[in-house]
């Protein structure tokens, strides 16, 4: 119709407004909106959310927590210090980064760099006080053997195992697993002393000249008694040197040494706690008389004059004994050392027909059979350990009684 009339929509609208007296007004078109009225927004300030890497703790923070927990758990201060030192090396090599940021590349870098460092760099005047970067820039730096490299990798692996167990949201896997270097196996002779070597070690004149008669020897009584105790008890160097007088006593009819953990004494493992009956040879050289005298003097430790170093009480005695082995022509690098006395004790008992579980009980080794573990939780009784173990220990042709001294003259 609009097309036939020749008029526009506005023409028709104006005619209608005029005919019905409708006041012309401007109408604003409305678009229907069924959405609800907007409410006043909350006043929330937009913030940049930190990444998970940024909020994960740094290596140094975790090191402090890890070391503190180990000390609380009763691990030895020495092994804990070694762990801490190696973790410090890791931080120096890869940086004090968040634990989530540690990558397989970081682990490989640690292995590569630690392999190039000298073994005793902290003890050597040449390297002492230098950073790892400075040491690697020097000429003629010899790297480490696989055995020691693996020991360092193992320490870091222990740290990251702890991180994985305690902070799995940041450390889902241990990048130090499987990094150990394969070591070539050598047919290394057992590190025990032969009977001929024991004769050289405990020959009266050289032994006394190196211990109580040595004018330059400090800790004369300790350097005298400790090796004799070791060969007759199988005790470790530190176990002997830290021994308390209250741990030398009679139980029933048997004189014993109690090897135990206390506030002042540390052991290699919890299973190292044990009792060891005192051999007749120790009585012949006056060890019990010496202990009883020291108890009357109100001393606490058997070898009260030994001072504690970073590694414990046995450092000087171990060094003295190694020097002595060289003098008598017995020392072999990493093979014939003080610890060989313990191995000789064990081997001699086994060769003399002592049951393995009795030997384990005397040495603080974990029992291998389930029945022994269950039924002898408290350990074997002292009389059994003496009759079936210590009484069968003998060293052919060696008269330890000839080593007896007047130790009171040394005390003054």
What are these regions (language model features)?
Residues 209-216, 233, 296-301, 309-310, ...:
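Short, basic (Lys/Arg/His-rich) helix/loop patches that form interaction surfaces
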Residues 242-285:
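Conserved tyrosine-mediated DNA breakage-rejoining catalytic core shared by Y-recombinases
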Residues 280, 297, 368-369, 380-412:
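C-terminal secondary-structure termini that scaffold catalytic or DNA-interacting sites
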Residues 161-174, 222, 230-253, 356-361:
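Short, charged phosphate-coordinating catalytic segments
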